[in-house]
């Protein structure tokens, strides 16, 4: 199975190589609409869906990030017009079942297991989505403790900047995709991949190279 991975799109919707699965590790929505629920819903339902329709892959797996504020509002049940499940179903229908959202969930596709979790350490500047409010106050509460063994782990947070995530995911994945810190470090020998397509200045990288792996049958 050929798998590509990107993160930190912030509304930039790149071309990708032909593959079986595209994984998106958070911060998908455009910056100018991220705090407007109506405009965010429209962006997901029209702009994102139209892009997905043209992608040369069979499945798109999305894990939200801290800028995907509308998704967290749905997760928290704060939107009176639509639930998270209804939103997921809508995007699935509009993309002919091509898109799957994962929030602390395990998903299996063609024998390969994917687990996604969006949580990050608190930023302490403005209010952002999926901030782990227990991060600094209770070492025994952790949103990452339910990470299971899986083939592909997708997190928005970078484990090299979050000791809880690093501890909880160690040895549980074959490949780990993440972003959040646009120019953050990753270690190829650990099968870690920083998938951000933007620089710290929110500019698309020159000569962008999409993270791509080939998962062979004997790797499963």
Question: Each predicted region: which residue ranges?
Answer:
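Active-site-proximal beta-strand elements of phosphoester/diester hydrolases
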Residues: 1-10, 23-25, 111-121, 151-156, ...
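Core catalytic region of metal-dependent phosphoesterases/phosphodiesterases
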Residues: 6-109, 168-170
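Catalytic metal-binding/acid-base residues of hydrolase active sites
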Residues: 10, 28-29, 66-68, 106, ...
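Short aromatic-enriched loop/helix-cap "lid" or pocket-rim segments at secondary-structure transitions
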Residues: 16-18, 72-76, 126-128, 188-190, ...
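Active-site-proximal loop/helix segment associated with metal-binding centers of metalloenzymes
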Residues: 32-36, 74-89, 112-161
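Conserved beta-sheet core of the metallophosphoesterase superfamily
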Residues: 59-63, 158-220
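Structural motif
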Residues: 109-110, 213
